[in-house]
Swiss-Prot record:
Family designation: Belongs to the TRAFAC class TrmE-Era-EngA-EngB-Septin-like GTPase superfamily. Era GTPase family.
Domain Era-type G: 8-175
Any GO MF annotation of the entry: ribosomal small subunit binding
Residues involved in GTP binding: 16-23, 63-67, 125-128
Primary location recorded for the protein, binned into one broad class: cytoplasm
Role: An essential GTPase that binds both GDP and GTP, with rapid nucleotide exchange. Plays a role in 16S rRNA processing and 30S ribosomal subunit biogenesis and possibly also in cell cycle regulation and energy metabolism.
Matches recorded under Gene3D superfamilies: 3.30.300.20, P-loop containing nucleotide triphosphate hydrolases
UniProt lineage: Bacteria, Bacillati, Bacillota, Bacilli, Lactobacillales
Record-given protein name: GTPase Era
Region ranges (G2): 42-46
Species assigned in the record: Lactiplantibacillus plantarum (strain ATCC BAA-793 / NCIMB 8826 / WCFS1) (Lactobacillus plantarum)
């Protein structure tokens, strides 16, 4: 009888400044969108867990909010959420952009990584956007910052070197159980992912002052008939002046947000969806603990 192959499992944190491609890498690894992507800072607000499973390995990736200097209770929640993962994982991926020089934000994170005992990998993203000589300059800027386990230049968007990174991480994980079923790619409920897909479209389509003031609450999900799933959601904003931006002339912007979000939600659920969106003004919600909790930002969950 052939000896059964040992199963390896563990947890990997993805950490870095806002907009370095953490969510793009997570989605690439699991093969489906579980974390929203945008060129706006602070896109990810919760720790998103993506699950990568093969015949002999299960890696649970935690995509943290981008670390930045907080300016509100929500910002404080995001940074605490990111830093709280570091002592609980088997490996840490510190992601940077190949097309950006090392700055104060990177040094802020590096200082906090100095106390981490787990192996830390420097992952240099967006190598498809720079000349190889520039990549060497970036590597030189970081080479002595921390005792890196390894340095991996990748393109999360194109997939360059991502498989090689996964192979290396597999060797880092201890023998352990399979925590989740093989076909499960995230531990977040569908409601959360649907709300994030809607928020992603708000981030993509609205002007700079709106995205940071936006939350999305799923009011109901139910099968309306044999053909469609009926989703009702409310887009929360902070100021009345933002309501007109979200709705648009004659409702054009809200319709566009709904149309693009519905497409992604249908892909997620594998079914036809009727999406009904509302817009509500809730002043200063980012600094109100009761509202943060009701919108899904609970510090005690982290």
């Amino acid at each position: 009888m052939a000896e059964q192959q040992a199963f390896h499992s563990g947890f990997v944190a993805i950490i870095g400044r806002p907009n370095v491609g953490k969510s793009t890498l997570l989605n690439r690894v699991v093969g489906q969108k579980v974390a929203i992507m945008s060129d706006k800072a602070q896109t990810t607000r919760n720790r998103i867990q993506g699950i990568y499973t093969t015949a002999d390995t299960q890696m649970v990736f935690i995509d943290t909010p981008g670390i930045h200097k907080p300016h509100s209770r929500l910002g404080d929640f995001m940074v605490k959420s990111a830093l709280s993962t570091l002592g609980e994982v088997d490996a840490v991926l510190f992601m940077i952009n190949a097309d950006e020089r090392r700055g104060a934000g990177d040094n802020f994170i590096i200082d906090r990584l100095k106390t981490v005992k787990q192996p830390i990998y420097l992952v240099i993203n967006k190598i498809d956007q720079v000349h190889p000589d520039h990549l060497l300059e970036i590597m030189d800027q970081y080479k002595d910052a921390l005792p890196w386990k390894e340095v991996y230049p990748i393109s999360a968007l194109e997939g360059n070197n991502v498989d090689e990174l996964l192979t290396t991480l597999k060797g880092q994980l201890p023998e352990g159980p399979q925590y989740y079923p093989s076909d499960q790619i995230t531990d977040h409920p569908e409601r959360f992912i649907i709300s994030e897909l809607i928020r992603e479209k708000v981030l993509e389509l609205t002007r700079q002052e709106v995205p940071h003031s936006t939350a999305v609450v799923i009011d109901s999900i139910k099968r309306q008939d044999e053909e469609k799933i009926h989703v009702q959601a409310t887009i929360i904003i902070e100021r009345s002046s933002q309501k007109g931006i979200i709705i648009g002339k004659g409702g054009s912007m809200l319709k566009k947000i709904g149309s693009l979000a519905r497409r992604d939600i249908e892909h997620l659920l594998g079914d036809k969806v009727y999406l009904e969106l509302w817009v509500k003004v809730q002043e200063n919600w980012k600094d109100r603990q009761d509202l943060l909790a009701s919108y899904g930002y609970r510090q005690d969950d982290y």
